[in-house]
A protein has these predicted regions:
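N-terminal Rossmann-like FAD-binding beta1-loop-alpha1 element of flavoenzymes
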Residues: 3-32
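C-terminal lid/capping helical subdomain adjacent to the catalytic/cofactor pocket in oxidative enzymes
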Residues: 440, 450-520
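Active-site/ligand-binding neighborhood in enzyme catalytic cores
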Residues: 135-138, 143-280, 285, 293, ...
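Short loop/edge segments at beta-strand edges and connector loops
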Residues: 115, 270-272, 473
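Dinucleotide-binding Rossmann-like beta1-alpha1 core, especially the glycine-rich loop
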Residues: 49-158
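Mid-domain catalytic core of redox enzymes
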Residues: 25, 246, 270-427, 455, ...
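Conserved Rossmann-like nucleotide-cofactor binding loop
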Residues: 14, 38, 312
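Glycine-rich FAD pyrophosphate-binding loop
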Residues: 23-48
Length: 520
């Protein structure tokens, strides 16, 4: 009997997970099609002169045991003699032996590091805890008058919440009060999306900061537990204090998975783009693929198709005439684009007050309205192995825009100069300490919850009619998934195929629970 084939469009976490699961659990042959020159999608690692760039920052944690096990099967956790770092699940200790006898990152590359989490907000040229806490430091920096206003504003919101919550502004004010919304949320969020918060549906808050509020942040501050449980099931995501991280960044995980797929007999084609999908009788029959190096097109028969490509593009390349309303909704879906300025500096002006060394933050939310930069990563603090020279500081300056914006097309040297100037303006570096830089542009990084999104179910229902087409991943579902959610959509799609389940409902239900997300 001829072996069945699955064509997988997209070599990010969802696509590679689907391919690996098919090879591990079935005799279905996967073929991964990736448009770019490397795997990983937005979870890839870029490299520049020996330094590594994690695009957007990817902490490896999940409330899913299945995902945590999957990661550690691919890349074991580093050795540690400290019991506190043992991973635990639902009160049961797991992989204690691995945690105690894992590989040494000094001698082994295929290893997960255990890293401390620290994120803060930069506002009025000062650093504040994120999530906010009523520490002496916060009180001193905010001042009693502003703090009092924030407290009264929160009490007012708690007593008279906005109902119904029509937009993101309402969502945040109901949980933090208007004063803290204006102080710590408004500027950054509007940089990310390029539109006012009152024009963004509340769905975005439900996906990215759900479960968090002033009361939970205070409870966490007062009852801090350092149990060492990296999966931390009962901790709201933005309060998690430890995470796992591949030695050379998230791309190392997905490059390793791609290698495993090829060793098991699967194929991964880089610089190949899906340009057409043939359908018949309610199913996908073939995918046409273009080799970006030669321009040659090939049509590949498919028994199953997994798509993590943007939904807008998927509807466009289907050979069937979708109803006009479906095409209109698909064409109206919007995406926010993104670029990172990698900046190597001699040192930062911000120092740890206790040690005088480099601050320990993984990333910093820039809430300053007088600069365009939205977020700053300090790659040394993600993994010391991301930096060629540990005596220098390797930064990632994150900017959000549309591909049509003028800033997107500015030459790299101008963007490097912009980033250097802005960090100097807000007191994070001395521009004279800048040594080198690069620019990484990423299209369609963030599927937007505005545009035609409120009618997205019309597109979803149409695509679900194709019995062997599975929409997975962030852009594949037009949902603001983290990488573990993207993986779960692929895992469940494979589950359905192997179990003969035709309903796609469980795939779409991933990441709809009201308890999980890192605020980004």
């Amino acid at each position: 009997m001829q072996r069945k084939t699955a064509v997988i469009v997209g070599g990010g976490p969802a696509g590679l997970t689907a391919a690996y699961e098919l090879l591990k659990r079935s005799d279905i042959q996967p073929l991964v099609i990736e448009q770019s020159s490397q795997v990983g999608g937005i979870s890839r690692t870029e490299r520049y002169r020996g330094n590594h760039i994690d695009i957007g920052g990817h902490r490896f944690f999940s409330k899913s045991d299945r995902v945590m096990n999957w990661w550690l099967d691919i890349m074991p956790m580093e050795q540690t003699t400290e019991q506190a770092f043992a991973i635990q699940y639902q009160g049961q200790s797991r992989s204690v032996e691995q945690a105690g006898e894992g590989p040494d990152p000094e001698t082994t590359d295929r290893v997960m590091l255990i890293r401390p989490r620290k994120s803060r907000i930069y506002w009025r040229r000062r650093l504040f805890d994120y999530p906010l806490s009523l520490s002496a430091d916060t009180i001193r920096k905010m001042g009693l008058i502003r703090l009092g206003r924030a407290g009264l504003s929160y009490l007012r919101a708690a007593a008279c919440p906005v109902t119904p919550e029509r937009n993101l502004q309402d969502f945040i004010i109901n949980r933090f009060g208007r004063e803290l919304y204006n102080t710590f949320f408004k500027s950054y969020t509007e940089k990310v999306w390029g539109v006012p918060c009152n024009e963004i549906p509340a769905d975005w808050g439900a996906q990215r900061i759900k479960g968090l509020s002033i009361l939970k942040a205070l409870k966490h501050a007062l009852m801090k537990q350092r149990s060492g449980d990296v999966s931390q099931k009962n901790t709201e995501t933005s309060l998690i204090e430890r995470f796992l991280y591949p030695k050379f960044g998230p791309g190392q995980m997905w490059e390793t998975v791609a290698g495993e797929i090829q060793e098991r007999g699967g194929e991964v084609l880089l610089r190949h783009t899906a340009t057409g999908i043939a359908t018949a009788n309610g199913a996908v029959r073939a995918v046409t693929v273009r080799n970006e190096d030669t321009g040659r097109e090939t049509t590949i028969p498919a028994d199953y198709v997994f798509s993590s490509m943007p939904v807008r593009e998927l509807v466009r390349i289907l050979d069937t005439d979708a109803p006009g309303s479906v095409r209109d909704v698909a064409n109206g879906l919007m995406y926010r684009d993104f670029f990172t300025v990698g900046l190597l500096v001699e040192k930062m002006k911000l120092e740890d007050p206790q040690t005088g060394d480099r601050i320990r933050d993984n990333w910093i939310y820039i809430q300053e309205p007088d600069v365009l930069i939205g977020r700053l990563q300090i790659f040394n603090n993600w993994s010391p192995y991301l930096v060629a020279d540990p005596s220098k500081t390797w930064l990632g300056l994150e900017y959000f825009c549309y591909e049509s914006d003028a800033i997107w097309s500015r030459p790299d040297p101008e963007l490097i100069e912009l980033g250097t100037r802005e960090l100097g303006k807000i007191g994070i570096i001395d521009p004279r300490d800048a040594l080198d830089g690069c620019v990484i542009r990423v299209k369609k990084t963030y599927p937007a919850y505005f545009g035609s999104y409120t009618r997205f179910n019309e597109v979803r229902d149409y695509l679900d009619r194709f019995e062997n087409l599975f929409c997975v991943g962030r852009n594949g579902q037009h949902r603001y998934n983290n990488q573990d959610h993207s993986m779960l959509t692929a895992m469940i799609a494979v589950d359905n195929i192997l179990a003969g389940i035709t309903s796609k409902k469980a795939i779409w239900e991933v990441n709809t629970e009201e308890e999980y997300h890192e605020a980004k």
